[in-house]
Amino acid sequence: MDVVLDVLDTFVLDRVYASVLPGGNSTSDFDTSFFLNQHVGRYYPLQPSQWATASRWKRDDLPRQATSLLFITWLFGLAIYFIGSTIFYHTWWDKTLLKHPRFLKNQVRLEIEQALFSIPIMAILTVPFFLAEIRGWSKLYDFASEAPFPAYNWLQYPLFVAFTDSGIYWIHRAEHHPLVYRWLHKRHHKWLVPTPYASFAFNPLDGWAQSLPYHVYPMLFPLQKGAYLGLFVFVTLWTVLIHDADCLSHSAIINGPECHTLHHLYFNYNYGQFTTFWDRVGGTYRKARGDEFKIVKSQ
């Protein structure tokens, strides 16, 4: 995220902050690029903008960084949500489910409204993790040569999936405990027959809690920055995909739309995010019968 922030500061945010909170000194001294664009400078020698020091809020001021990260996370989340959900809804999602007796009146609109409410709050709650990352408190690294050992550049992907799949399973399962389910997770189970737009239609604390493993991982284990951004996009789109409510795969290993749709219908099964491993270990795995989706679509 530090590289992203350097780039956006240079091309967008420097001028915005200089306009909204003027008070610094405009500069054309590009020697300051050594101080202002250190992170992106490791990849490409990007010169700072003429407004780089023209705001009272300097680039490394905590309030400015927090504000920038909030809007980046918020807008990025909205973009991925609407692009991914719209594509899946208009391509793979079975429109016959609109007539399902458990499909709510105006459900798509209600799902979008809930997501629009939740995404900015989740962004606020996520900002501290990104602040920690850009201030050097994580184990993110820039180049493959900086990995603990060469093979780690490939191992980081399955390790990330394994760690987050485990964490999300136990967090998700805990959210179904009677003491917290009603006020934390029940809102997401309002959508018994979900559309892709239900992917972020939940209590914002619920969504944030289930995202914690993604942000904890780079605090504990090395992760290349490019891989981190790619995985961030992947997990967001995966969250949309598993709410597609269609059977794209009968895999006994992958926790795809089939497994997650059964979770929405029967509640106490298939808590996993990527695989069925922890559901099998925890005794919560439910496999679809051969005719189950025909029954679901004809009820």
List each language-model region with its residue ranges:
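Cytosolic/stromal cytosol-facing helical appendages immediately following the last transmembrane segment
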Residues: 1-63, 67, 93-104, 175-299
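Hydrophobic alpha-helical transmembrane segments of multi-pass integral membrane proteins
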Residues: 9, 72-84, 117-133, 159-161, ...
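Hydrophobic alpha-helical transmembrane segments
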Residues: 67-71, 75, 116, 154-158, ...
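Membrane-water interface at transmembrane helix exits
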Residues: 84-93, 126-134, 138, 168-176, ...
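Membrane-embedded alpha-helical segments that form the functional core of polytopic membrane enzymes
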Residues: 148-169, 173, 229, 235-239
